[in-house]
């Protein structure tokens, strides 16, 4: 097979591992900088152009699109879909998962476990917003934040009100969520591929840090999932329409609660923690599905 990885940096661990795994399994793998692609939209023969010429026909693409370039990145993926190329994650599913609010609304509609969550832009009654999620301590998030940036823990209602007022001054959209104390600053990252959890790790926040992101000094270790946690992760991926994703879950007194679904999960932490060759599992899934044309929304929306 001929596979393209859409990535802005071929030296990133996840990109390198996917190239290695693809080549070891006998495939031709190219890394293409998403932002350097440009497209011929209106011709009867749609194409993606790169470095002054049309890209060759690929059997599959693996989008590794950063949050900051979601709009352009998904446009490139959509163009590949219009050309009949299989994408492990479709453009519409990536866009859906990048909208944190829409993701939460979709998962809530399906009855999946979520922390109590409020959404606001310029609330006229901040106290009522806090009361609706159970009061302090609360976690306040910028809707557009990634990797733990723009996430604040407010220990008291007074602190929470001050933070929300500051975000209001920035004209920002914010999420306010109940703080799950029993999680102890840890979460679980489940890697779902093809409707199955293929690997899982526990991420523990650094001392005194409630955010468990590895980018923020958190540590990763192997973990055994409960059947309910496994089901929750698989269902979250299904609701988002993602064939490959990282589902972040908190262990709470009310069962597993979903924090986020990531359409471009990093591989370094989970391969190190589990010892699994996750990259090869992803390529093998593509081998099984690329020619089935089983994607439901190809080239639409």
From Swiss-Prot:
Its cofactor is Mg(2+); Mn(2+). Mn(2+) 1 binds at residues 248, 260. Mg(2+) 2 binds at residues 260, 262. Pfam families: RimK, Rimk_N. Keywords: ATP-binding, Ligase, Magnesium, Manganese, Metal-binding, Nucleotide-binding, Protein biosynthesis. It comes from the Bacteria. Binds 2 magnesium or manganese ions per subunit. One of its GO terms (molecular function) is ribosomal S6-glutamic acid ligase activity. InterPro entries: ATP-grasp, ATP-grasp_RimK-type, ATP_grasp_subdomain_1, RimK, Rimk_N, Rp_bS6_RimK/Lys_biosynth_LsyX. ATP binds at residues 141, 178-179, 187, 211-213. Mg(2+) 1 binds at residues 248, 260. Residues 104-287 form the ATP-grasp domain. GO terms for cellular component: cytoplasm. Its EC number is 6.3.2.-. Mn(2+) 2 binds at residues 260, 262. One of its GO terms (biological process) is protein modification process. SUPFAM superfamilies: Glutathione synthetase ATP-binding domain-like (SSF56059). HAMAP family: RimK. NCBIfam families: PRK10446.1, rimK_fam. Belongs to the RimK family. PANTHER family: RIBOSOMAL PROTEIN BS6--L-GLUTAMATE LIGASE, RIBOSOMAL PROTEIN S6 MODIFICATION PROTEIN. This is Probable alpha-L-glutamate ligase. It comes from Marinomonas sp. (strain MWYL1).
């Amino acid at each position: 097979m001929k596979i393209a990885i859409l990535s802005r940096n071929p030296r990133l661990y996840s990109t390198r591992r996917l190239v290695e795994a693809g080549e070891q399994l006998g495939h031709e793998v190219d890394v293409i900088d998403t932002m350097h692609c440009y497209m011929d939209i209106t011709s009867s023969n749609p194409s993606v152009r790169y470095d002054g010429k049309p890209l060759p026909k690929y059997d599959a693409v693996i989008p590794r699109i950063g949050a900051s370039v979601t709009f352009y990145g998904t446009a490139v993926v959509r163009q590949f879909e219009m050309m009949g190329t299989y994408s492990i994650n479709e453009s519409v599913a990536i866009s859906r998962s990048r909208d944190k609010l829409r993701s939460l609304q979709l998962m809530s509609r399906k009855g999946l476990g979520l922390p109590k969550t409020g959404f606001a832009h310029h609330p006229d009654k901040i106290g009522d917003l806090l009361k609706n999620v159970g009061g302090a301590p609360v976690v306040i998030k910028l809707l557009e934040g990634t990797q733990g940036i723009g996430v604040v823990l407010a220990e008291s209602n007074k602190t929470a009100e001050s933070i929300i007022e500051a975000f209001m001054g920035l004209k920002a959209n914010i999420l306010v969520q109940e703080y799950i104390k029993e999680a102890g600053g840890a979460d679980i990252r489940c890697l779902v591929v093809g409707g199955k959890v293929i690997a899982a790790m526990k991420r523990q926040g650094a001392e005194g840090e409630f955010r468990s992101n590895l980018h923020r000094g958190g540590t990763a270790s192997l973990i055994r999932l409960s059947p309910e946690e496994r089901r929750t992760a698989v269902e979250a991926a299904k609701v988002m329409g993602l064939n490959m994703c990282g589902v972040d879950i908190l262990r709470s007194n009310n069962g597993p609660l979903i924090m986020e679904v990531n359409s471009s999960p990093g591989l370094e932490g989970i391969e190190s923690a589990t010892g699994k060759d996750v990259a090869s599992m992803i390529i093998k899934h593509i081998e099984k599905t690329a020619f089935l044309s089983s994607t439901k929304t190809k080239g639409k929306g």
